[in-house]
Every structure is written in C-alpha cells, then in structure tokens.
Amino acid sequence: MAKSISQETLHQMVTRWASPRPDNYRFKIFKDTSDFFRVEYGSVVVLDEKPFLVLGNAKEGRFGIDDQEKFWVKRSIDLTDGSRKIIKLVFYEKFMAKIGGIPWECFRSPKKEARVLKLVAGHKNFMQGYAVEDEKGNVVRVLDVIKGKTLHAYLQNLESDHQTYFYELFPDILSKYIECIKAIKFLHENGEKHGDIRRDH
C-alpha cells in the first residue's frame, strides 16, 4: 500500500513550484486514474509515490483545426523537482481508417506506448518518458515536455525566396528530416510501428 501524502505536504510542495493555494484548499488526490474526466485542474496524481500537480488537459491542433482538448492527457508539474510533464492516462479508443479503399482498425495501446518508451530511452530523436502503473494497474505514461516548434510550424513561418530556401535552408531541413526517417527505421528494426505519423507532429 502506497504511503498517503498529507494536504500540508502538498501545499508546501505546490508553493515551491506553482502559485500557492489558499490554506483551506483541499487537493483531490488520485492514485486510481481510471476515470480521467475526474482528474482536473488542481488535482494531484500520485504515481509510484511521486505526486504530480495537474495544470489542465493537453490540447493538440490538427491540420489547421483549432486546438482539440485531449481529456486523457494532462499537463502537470512533478512536485518532487518542479519539472513539467505530460501524463497520458489510459484511454482505449478504437476507430476505423481507410487508405486506397482498404479499411483497418486503429486503436490506442498504453502497453505498446510503454514498450516503445522503454525501447527509445536515451534516443535523441524520440520523446522521452517512462511508464508506471497506478494502484489499479492502469499503464500511465509520464512524458518530458518538448519545447519548440514542429517542423511543420517552422516551415510555415519561413520567409525567403525559393532560391535562398533551396540552397541555404533546405539542406539543413532535409538533413533533420532524414534523421526522423532513420528514427522510424529504428522502430521498425525493433519490431515496432509508430502508428501516428503526421506532417503536423
């Protein structure tokens, strides 16, 4: 049984890394993340006895569409060291996709994501993080935040004529793109597939 963490201790930890809460504020503490809708702003998720303050749901824009909220993905602060983390809670989504008239089923797999995170640990061309089970056995992924723009956003904001782009900017862009392709090759060589390759990632 995991040790319980007191409200007083949480207030002290939060004050160190974020805006302090009123003295009478009571943090909702989650060791079971099964109902991810209940895990909201100001909650604390405890994973392997480590507390994370939830800052809100992550959002992701897609192909020019405004940011879409991902209710199972939480922005957070690791209260032991103040680092920003993304916490992906378990969400078993399934949907059908079709390319060239061929349909297939797509689904989210927390165990696969956990396996891939372990495989790519320390690889400079992959997001870093780790997986941990909550007290109900849900495989939660804790990810480091990547700062900066996507390649897509970077290219959209370039202002140069074609010749300057092609001779001065493109060689470096292509070199970085090839690194991305080699990273995907690394996954394939190790029996894994990415599953969500998009130009806006």
Regions found by a protein language model. Name each.
Residues 2-63:
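Juxta-kinase regulatory segment immediately upstream of eukaryotic protein kinase catalytic domains
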Residues 146-161:
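Structural motif in protein kinase domains
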Residues 176-177:
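Activation segment signature within eukaryotic-like protein kinase domains
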Residues 121-132:
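Conserved HxN/HPN-centered segment at the entrance to the catalytic loop
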Residues 188-201:
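Catalytic-loop of the protein kinase fold
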Residues 60-118:
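ATP-binding glycine-rich loop module of kinase domains
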Residues 136-150:
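Conserved short submotifs of the Hanks-type protein kinase catalytic core
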Residues 180-187:
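Conserved hydrophobic alpha-helix
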